[in-house]
């Protein structure tokens, strides 16, 4: 009887550890995709911040106008 209880306890502990590992992996993967989206936004801004001339500034302003998230053009003038 005692062996059965020990076996059941060990089984429950293993199940709990595996369940938490799967949950932690899902959380890491969700954080990773959010981080990737932020990185893409930063890369887009770097393209706009580094204009080589008026043509690129105009393209930057045009891209900014077409984006619903863009509220001002101050990063285009740098």
Swiss-Prot record:
GO terms for molecular function: toxin activity. Keywords: Disulfide bond, Secreted, Signal, Toxin. Contains 2 disulfide bonds. It is found in: Secreted. Residues 25-28 form a propeptide. Residues 1-24 form the signal peptide. GO terms for cellular component: extracellular region. Expressed by the venom gland. Its main location: secreted. Belongs to the scoloptoxin-04 family. This is U-scoloptoxin(04)-Er1b. The lineage of its organism: Eukaryota, Metazoa, Ecdysozoa, Arthropoda, Myriapoda.
